[in-house]
Amino acid sequence: MRTFAIFLLIALGWLQYTLWFGKNGMSDYAQVSNDVALQEEVNQGLRNRNEQMFAEIDDLKKGSEAIEERARHELGMIKKGETFYRIIDENSEG
């Protein structure tokens, strides 16, 4: 009977060790939980970026204002009859 109790105690100790420190134990669970949380943050940032891009695509497809804005800022274009004034601050760098 005494050897059986010792065997059960050793088995309990081994099971506790594998639960806390073994493969797929609590330490692995905590690490995976942290990894999942970080990946969810990254995914949310990418979702937000995608939504902005889809909105910009829709705006470019449907409206001419976005096209005009891009032409003005990226290509320096102006409409006929418009005058473009560029004001440069003396204190600005670059």
UniProtKB/Swiss-Prot annotation:
Belongs to the FtsB family. GO terms for cellular component: cell division site; cell septum; plasma membrane. The keyword Cell cycle applies. Residues 33-71 form a coiled coil. InterPro entries: Cell_div_FtsB, FtsL/DivIC. Residues 22-94 are periplasmic. This is Cell division protein FtsB. Keywords: Cell cycle, Cell division, Cell inner membrane, Cell membrane, Coiled coil, Membrane, Transmembrane, Transmembrane helix. The chain crosses the membrane at residues 4-21. Signal peptide: none annotated. Residues 1-3 are cytoplasmic. GO terms for biological process: FtsZ-dependent cytokinesis.
